[in-house]
A protein has these predicted regions:
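Short, Lys/Arg-enriched N-terminal segments with co-localized hydrophobic residues
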Residues: 5, 9-27
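Short Lys/Arg-enriched alpha/beta "domain-start" segment
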Residues: 28-87
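N-terminal accessory interaction module
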Residues: 65-125
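Acidic, aromatic-enriched beta-alpha/helix-loop junctions
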Residues: 71-86, 180-229
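Short acidic, Pro/Gly- and aromatic-enriched capping/linker segments at domain boundaries
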Residues: 138-163, 236-258
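Subunit-assembly interface segments of extracellular/virion macromolecular structures
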Residues: 167-169
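Short, surface-exposed, low-complexity cationic segments
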Residues: 173-202, 269-289
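Tight coil/turn sites that cap or link beta-strands
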Residues: 244-284
Length: 289
C-alpha cells in the first residue's frame, strides 16, 4: 500500500466575507484546497456562511454530483490544513485550526458516496490513524486478537468485524437468543436525523426507553414525554416510536441502507457505533434502536 503523503499546506481564512465570490477569494486560497481534494478525486467548495450555526463541513449535491462544502461563519477565524493525503484510498485528513482549538476531519469515499467524519484524539496525524481512532475500544481489541495482517485491519470486513458506514458488527458466535425475543426489520440510528440502517433480525438488552418523533429525533425519556403531553396534548399525534437508547444490540441476517451495499451476517454480531461522537468537532449523536 502506498505510503501517506504529508501535505503541510495551511489555508488561512480570516473573517471570511459572505458577500461576493471575489471577496472570499481575496481572504482565502481556495485553489490550494481544491487541488488537495482533487488529488482524491473530489470536488470542494469553500464559501462564507450567513450565520455561525451554518458554518462547518458537509456533503452537498449539485448537477455534477456530490462535493465537499466548507462554510466559514461571519467573523470566524480558522485555518484549514491537509495534514495527510492518501490518493490510493481516496481519503485525506483535514485539520481546522482555530484560536483555541484544533478539529480534525477524515474526508473520503466509502462504497458509493463521499463522507466527512470528525476524528477524536488530539494526536491523530495520518489517515490510517484517523480510521483506527474511529474504531471503538472493543473493536480495536478484537482486531488485535483476530487480525494478523496489518493491511487487513482497515478493511470493511475482516476476522474481527464487518463495517457498514458508521456501524461495526463484531461476531459473537456463542450467543443464543430465544425466538420470542428476536425483532424483525429493526432500524438502528445515530439519532440525529440520519437515515437508519435496517437489520433483518435483532436482539437488544438493557438501555433506556425513549420516545422518538421527527420533532424529537434524539428521543425523550418517559418523564419528559409525559411532561410534554401535559403542556401540549396535541403532541400525542406526532407519530411517536418507542426505541431504546444505548442498549446492547445484536443482529444477524441482512443489513441494508440506501447508501451502502447490503451485507449478510450468518451469526449474531454485537452492534457498535464509531467514535465520531467523542470528537470535539462532531455534533451530538446518540445510539437509538
Amino acid at each position: 500500500m502506498q505510503a501517506g503523503i504529508s501535505v503541510p499546506r495551511r489555508l488561512e481564512i480570516q473573517r471570511a466575507s459572505t458577500s461576493t465570490p471575489n471577496t472570499e477569494r481575496k481572504n482565502m486560497d481556495t485553489n490550494a484546497i481544491e487541488t488537495m481534494f482533487g488529488r482524491i478525486g473530489a470536488r470542494v467548495r469553500v464559501s462564507g456562511a450567513p450565520h455561525p450555526r451554518l458554518a462547518g463541513i458537509d456533503i452537498q449535491t449539485d448537477r455534477y454530483g456530490e462535493f465537499f462544502d466548507i462554510k466559514v461563519g461571519p467573523e470566524e477565524q480558522v485555518g484549514y490544513e491537509v495534514i495527510d493525503l492518501r490518493p490510493d484510498m481516496r481519503h485525506l485528513l483535514l485539520m481546522a485550526r482555530r484560536p483555541n482549538a484544533k478539529h480534525k476531519f477524515l474526508c473520503g469515499h466509502d462504497e458509493r458516496h463521499w463522507f466527512v467524519c470528525a476524528i477524536p484524539g488530539g494526536s491523530v496525524s495520518s489517515v490510517k490513524a484517523a480510521i483506527e481512532a474511529l474504531q471503538p475500544p472493543e473493536v480495536r481489541s478484537a482486531v488485535r486478537r483476530r487480525v494478523k495482517r496489518v493491511k487487513d485491519r482497515l478493511r470493511r470486513r475482516n476476522a474481527a468485524f464487518v463495517r457498514q458506514g458508521e456501524w461495526f458488527f463484531v461476531p459473537v458466535p456463542e450467543l443464543t437468543v430465544k425466538e420470542t425475543l428476536i425483532l424483525k426489520n429493526e432500524p438502528i440510528s445515530r439519532g440525529n436525523g440520519s437515515k437508519s440502517h435496517v437489520c433483518q433480525f435483532a436482539y437488544r438488552s438493557g438501555g433506556e426507553a425513549v420516545y422518538v418523533s421527527t420533532r424529537y429525533p434524539l428521543g425523550l425519556t418517559r418523564d419528559a414525554y409525559s411532561r410534554l403531553l401535559k403542556r401540549n396534548p396535541s403532541a400525542r399525534s406526532w407519530a411517536w416510536r418507542v426505541m431504546r437508547r444505548n442498549a446492547a444490540v445484536y443482529i444477524r441476517g441482512r443489513v441494508w441502507h440506501p447508501d451502502h451495499k447490503t451485507i449478510v451476517l450468518n451469526e449474531w454480531h454485537r452492534v457498535m457505533m464509531n467514535t465520531e461522537g467523542q470528537a470535539l468537532g462532531a455534533r451530538t449523536v446518540v445510539f437509538l434502536d
